[in-house]
């Protein structure tokens, strides 16, 4: 996402344009919408250096029924800083809605999108429907980062009605966030 939005953020910072930039994440791994902005390990093994990010804690693991990609406990440092500076907003979406949007996109565009991209597709569709209702004309750009051909098992679960949404409890997130490294200084 950082590379796609960089030119637009530059224009915003220079005061040339105003854009609505939306970061979309899974409701089952909501680092921006429910995480904390803190230093954390970039890996679950706690070997990599610490980075400042919105995080659920490096020990956070989404439910086994999470099939929608984007399993990482934290958000990139760049996107985290932009969110902290209120240069972008964040939304979380449930995986059944993500796969519904992905199938709609595949029917219309002939491309089976990766679940990761389908989070953005879900919100792009929602934004387009708002424009249709309000009559507002808006250019909507999203990142299509890959195909869903490696995710056929997840698509099959969705088609068979076996996919469930999972949203971690506040207690689950609190437990994980409490394990963040303690910064001194």
Q: What kind of feature is each model-predicted range?
A:
Residues 112-116:
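Short glycine/threonine-rich catalytic loop with a Thr-x-Gly-x-Asp
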Residues 19, 137-138:
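Nucleotide donor/acceptor-binding cores
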Residues 10-18, 23-111, 157-185:
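Active-site/ligand-binding loops adjacent to catalytic centers
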Residues 3-4, 70, 111, 147-149:
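Gly/Ser/Thr-rich helix-start
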Residues 1-6, 31-33, 117-125, 149-152:
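Short glycine/serine/threonine-rich phosphate/pyrophosphate-binding segments
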Residues 95-100, 121-134:
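A short, acidic, amphipathic alpha-helical segment used as a generic capping/interface helix at domain edges
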Residues 9-13, 129-132:
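A generic local secondary-structure boundary/capping motif
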Residues 23-25, 141-145:
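Short beta-strand segments
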């Amino acid at each position: 996402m950082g590379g796609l939005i960089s030119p637009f953020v530059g224009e915003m910072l220079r005061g040339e344009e105003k854009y609505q930039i939306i970061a979309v994440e899974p409701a089952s791994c909501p680092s921006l919408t429910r995480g904390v902005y803190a230093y954390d390990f970039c890996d679950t093994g706690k070997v990599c250096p610490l980075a400042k990010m919105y995080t659920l804690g490096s020990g956070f693991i989404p439910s086994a029924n999470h099939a929608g990609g984007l399993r990482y406990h934290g958000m990139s440092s760049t996107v985290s800083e932009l969110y902290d500076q209120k240069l972008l907003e964040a939304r979380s979406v449930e995986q059944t809605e993500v796969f519904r949007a992905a199938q709609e996109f595949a029917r219309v565009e002939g491309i089976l999108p990766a679940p990761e991209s389908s989070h953005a597709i879900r919100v792009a569709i929602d934004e387009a429907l708002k424009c249709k209702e309000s009559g507002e004309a808006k250019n909507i750009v999203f990142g299509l980062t890959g195909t869903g051909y490696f995710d056929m098992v997840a698509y099959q679960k969705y088609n068979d009605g076996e996919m469930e949404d999972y949203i971690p409890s506040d207690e689950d997130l609190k437990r994980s966030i409490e394990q963040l490294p303690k910064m001194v200084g």
